[in-house]
Amino acid sequence: MIPGEILTGDDPVEINAGRPVRTVLVRNMGDRPVQVGSHYHFAAANPALDFDRASAWGHRLAVPAGTAVRFEPGVEREIELVPLAGARVVPGLRPESAGPLDAASGTRIADTATIEDISGFQGEGS
C-alpha cells in the first residue's frame, strides 16, 4: 500500500446516492470564465453568473468532491445541484450569505431579504 492510497472495490461508486437533485439553468454574463468548486454554496457564486439564486439557496454542485465546473463567457448550461448536508452552516465565503442556511422558524433565509441583499446580485432571475 502507498501512503494516502485509497483502495476501492471493483464496482463504481455512486456519488450523491439518494440525494434530491435540482436542475438550474446558468449563464455567464461576464467577460471572463468563472469556475465554481464542488462544495461552494452555489447561490453565493460569482455575480456574473445569471440563474435563479433563491432556487439554488442551500445547494452545491452535484459533482465529485474536489472538482469544479467552468462557465465560459456568454455560455448557458444546465447544472445539477444537491442540498448542502451536515449542520447546514456556511462560514465565510461571501459575508452576506455566511451563516445558517435555514432559519430557526423553519423558513429558508432565501425567502427573506437576505438573498436579495447580497451585493452583486442583479435583476430578475439572478
Curated annotation (Swiss-Prot):
<dbReference type="InterPro" id="IPR002019">
    <property type="entry name" value="Urease_beta-like"/>
</dbReference>
<comment type="similarity">
    <text>Belongs to the urease beta subunit family.</text>
</comment>
<dbReference type="InterPro" id="IPR036461">
    <property type="entry name" value="Urease_betasu_sf"/>
</dbReference>
<comment type="subunit">
    <text>Heterotrimer of UreA (gamma), UreB (beta) and UreC (alpha) subunits. Three heterotrimers associate to form the active enzyme.</text>
</comment>
<protein>
    <recommendedName>
        <fullName>Urease subunit beta</fullName>
        <ecNumber>3.5.1.5</ecNumber>
    </recommendedName>
</protein>
<dbReference type="InterPro" id="IPR050069">
    <property type="entry name" value="Urease_subunit"/>
</dbReference>
<keyword id="KW-0378">Hydrolase</keyword>
<keyword id="KW-0963">Cytoplasm</keyword>
<dbReference type="GO" id="GO:0035550">
    <property type="term" value="C:urease complex"/>
</dbReference>
<dbReference type="GO" id="GO:0009039">
    <property type="term" value="F:urease activity"/>
</dbReference>
<comment type="pathway">
    <text>Nitrogen metabolism; urea degradation; CO(2) and NH(3) from urea (urease route): step 1/1.</text>
</comment>
<dbReference type="GO" id="GO:0043419">
    <property type="term" value="P:urea catabolic process"/>
</dbReference>
<dbReference type="Pfam" id="PF00699">
    <property type="entry name" value="Urease_beta"/>
</dbReference>
